[in-house]
Amino acid sequence: MYKKKIARLALCTALCALVTTSVFASPTKAKAKSHPRQPVKAVRQTAKAPAGYTHKQAVHDSATLRIGIREGRGSVAVTGPQGLGVYRGDMLWKKAAANVPVTIALSGTNLTVNGDISTVPVQVRSLVHGGSVKITDGYAYRGALEMMKSPGRWGLTVVNVLPVEQYLYGVVGKEMSPSWSEEALKAQAVAARTYAIAHKSRFSQRGFDLTDDTSSQVYAGINGESPSIIKAVNATKGEIITYQGRP
């Protein structure tokens, strides 16, 4: 935990060097009014960060993360406001109408989906592109929810599989108040993205990349989103901090 705090402190130091100048140093009031975003762009390209740190766009649009959101559960029920599809691999296996629960349970080493056996993990997705899946006793999520037998222990593991940028929508607002300044939220978005990429696959033996709690970054799915957070994440799309070439 101490090492984790030191790493985050170093990352924040680098971000301050790259962002703070854009917040406090406009050449003239007239120029600031006519080109409000120009100082930010210039700082991102030219500001001098601590030795070894680089601010760059390095995360591809197609990059995804696997976030562990449940472990050791006997069963999980999910719903979707636009209906759900249950997939085995790339094959659509079952459908459920809008807001009709789908229950996935563990049966020996297999899964059951509304009572029907599956010998392989399943993914539950909205039937509508951009839709959501909600755990009935928890949060709603973008992307897919993958259900599998928990590796090395009893029970089900539930993994949220989604693009990095959409993951950040549900993270940044749990690390910082959505009411903070736009530049502060952008800096936090870069920090959170950098952390996610640097620690990807940390929990691979448990079937996912990151947890949804303080062991990684607190993640609340769609329930953690707000317009100001989404705006900050989109404005810094793909940007991370590297130290000596590594996140």
Predicted segments, located by residue:
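Conserved, single-site charged/polar hotspot
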Residues: 2-247
